[in-house]
Regions:
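Hot-dog-fold acyl-thioester-processing enzymes
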Residues: 1-88, 153-170
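HotDog/MaoC-like acyl-thioester-processing domains
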Residues: 1-13, 94, 98-170
Length: 170
């Protein structure tokens, strides 16, 4: 997958949909996340219990882990390279389980875009994220709000003080 670091706020349009690559969520991901976060619930740490007693007859993965992986998949597209702040995560819904060895990908659609009133040269994007499993079933959805840099004008200096070039970071 090639990463495009040239996306600025100006390059996003309401209605655009971006699809990430897929990623398989492994048992190692589950164990590392549960250990790091301290979410030692039996359904996550006891394979026999998960098989016999969980609603899903298998090792379900914490929803928050899926949100983290989904955000990572979106970041890997390069579309957040000129991001300046993550302003919010709202409307989180977990609609179906993700089990170990499921493969997910994310469809990200631009819901709204406006220039920032408090940060000149920046815009605010609201985006809907739909996380889908290998069967096309939506497992999680949520909305993010991000602050991104606008494309610099040719005479506007970049971070290193040099005039902007096409694709140069602001």
């Amino acid at each position: 997958m090639s990463v495009d670091h040239t996306w600025y706020f100006d390059d996003f349009e309401v209605g655009q949909v971006h699809t990430t690559m897929g990623r398989t969520v492994t048992e190692t991901d589950l164990v590392n996340f549960v250990t790091f976060s301290g979410i030692f619930e039996e359904v996550f740490i006891n394979a026999e219990y998960a098989k016999s007693s969980s609603l899903f007859k298998g090792r379900a993965v914490p929803g928050l882990l899926i949100v983290v992986v989904a955000e990572g998949l979106y970041v890997q597209t390069g579309h957040t390279h000129h991001g300046r702040a993550y302003l919010g995560l709202d409307e989180l819904r977990l609609s179906a389980p993700v089990l170990c060895d499921d493969t997910i990908h994310v469809e990200v659609s631009v819901e709204s875009a406006r220039l920032s009133r408090s940060r000149p040269g920046h815009g605010i994007l609201a985006m809907r994220h739909r996380v889908l499993n290998q069967n096309g079933v939506e497992v999680i959805s949520y909305k993010t709000t991000r602050l991104l840099a606008c494309r610099p004008s040719p005479e506007q200096p970049t971070r290193d003080g040099q005039p902007a070039r096409d694709g140069a970071p602001a």
